[in-house]
Amino acid sequence: MNINVASLLNGNYILLLFVVLALGLCLGKVRLGSVQLGNSIGVLVVSLLLGQQHFAINTEALNLGFMLFIFCVGVEAGPNFFSIFFRDGKNYLMLALVMVGSAMVIAIGLGKLFHWDIGLTAGMLAGSMTSTPVLVGAGDTLRNTITNGPALLAAQDHLSLGYALTYLIGLVSLIFGARYLPKLQHQDLSTSAQQIARERGLDTDSQRKVYLPVIRAYRVGPELVAWADGKNLRELGIYRQTGCYIERIRRNGILANPDGDAVLQVGDEISLVGYPDAHARLDPSFRNGKEVFDRDLLDMRIVTEEIVVKNSNAVNKRLSQLKLTDHGCFLNRVIRSQIEMPIDDSIVLNKGDVLQVSGDARRVKSVAEKIGFISIHSQVTDLLAFCAFFIIGLLIGQITIQFSNFSFGIGNAAGLLMAGIMLGFLRANHPTFGYIPQGALNMVKEFGLMVFMAGVGLSAGAGIGNSLGAVGGQMLIAGLIVSLVPVVICFLFGAYVLRMNRALLFGAIMGARTCAPAMEIISDTARSNIPALGYAGTYAIANVLLTLAGSLIVVLWPGILG
């Protein structure tokens, strides 16, 4: 049996798409030194090579891919997006604006210098910034602004080419910049991290030890009753003195949860919960009694829940003001915009932050009701909300704004981004609305991006040979400039205008570039995870600004040429 692979792939778009994805994902695992190519560049390279052999897929698959990706970007940014504008995130907002704005201006200048079209210029900007949102925003706006078929195809091909030629340049140069730029400035990054740690009272060690509570049980003897001197539990203030609290009491065979009016009696059996050092602070009259090993008395249902910050008595409050340990609860993690933050008592909580809390199930539930709500542990996506807001995004994208003789269509990219932000924001405020498991969101976003990459690569591959020889050298120079110069500008602005702490500043710069590998290098250099505070501050807003930059550069281009 003879199988013509070329005919089989050309006759089956779905098969071709998944062959490209599979081969590209395999290529993406290849490492050049310490740098991994990554899924995006792997799929793009494979699709460009197959595109040269005149393989192609339906353009609707490309459109659906970019729509899913950009909508999911908005959903992820939504919970913390508005806090950037309305609170002390103004420094992070300004840094993100400087980074994206300077990169766009430099890209436009280089595009004019080298006499490129808008496709090459926007693609070079997207690749140099290692930013798929720029590519998506530019591609969508090109489809809305260029009505001539051949001109649109040429611009789209050049967009893919510019991205493919400069992506690896942008990634490698930023990683080297993250490694060596901190060493060129006069302040040591580790010292800056320690300074913030001293000011805010947090541990600079990224591997923070979390001690879980210990439960022990004792039989009340005459010595302990004498120590209590007839006072009830409220008057004794055991928790205030030691950090332990009485969780249960067994009296005459009956197990109960005591209230503050309970008075200890000889023969009672009590269970106390607290950190190990808290048990050590107990009065000797507790420990001198006979320790009890009773399954029911020692049985405490410890749970770990993710609590979403929502209520006004927690939003804009410092972490220390929650006094979680006073409620018998213990904090394990603080997550903002899918980024784990250092546990810092001075962190001001934003709406949508997630606190991972451990403790007795009843106590954790009580704390959650005061702070916000427990994130539901479901693997079921609210598809109705997902589809409804997706439709809203497409409808917003149809809006056209008219200024005199100039008209500007919002476009699907910006419309879906706005709808995604709205869905993410509402999800952070309503526990049962619009739930999308993080794993499902990641999968849809990644799949949409890979489909989009496969589409643009296959469409651009046919003409890549001729274009590569004409602009390859120029792209190398332009990619380095657009990748590194905005980083230097952002550093100077943050260091000497905003006067930011260097550890926070470098974290914020990497967040503005949305580059996780570079962020890891900054944390290693600082020997601390404190830069994550800055990274989280700029990451969400930068994703949105980069998408808008991709659309804006296409809109501005005709006027610049004129």
UniProtKB/Swiss-Prot annotation:
Main localization of the protein described in the UniProt heading: membrane
Cellular-component GO terms for this entry: plasma membrane
Alphabetic keyword roster: Cell membrane, Membrane, Repeat, Transmembrane, Transmembrane helix, Transport
Location(s) in or outside the cell: Cell membrane
GO biological process terms, semicolon-separated: potassium ion transport
Similarity comment: family membership: Belongs to the AAE transporter (TC 2.A.81) family. YbjL subfamily.
Protein name in UniProt: Putative transport protein Spro_1639
Source taxonomy: Bacteria, Pseudomonadati, Pseudomonadota, Gammaproteobacteria, Enterobacterales
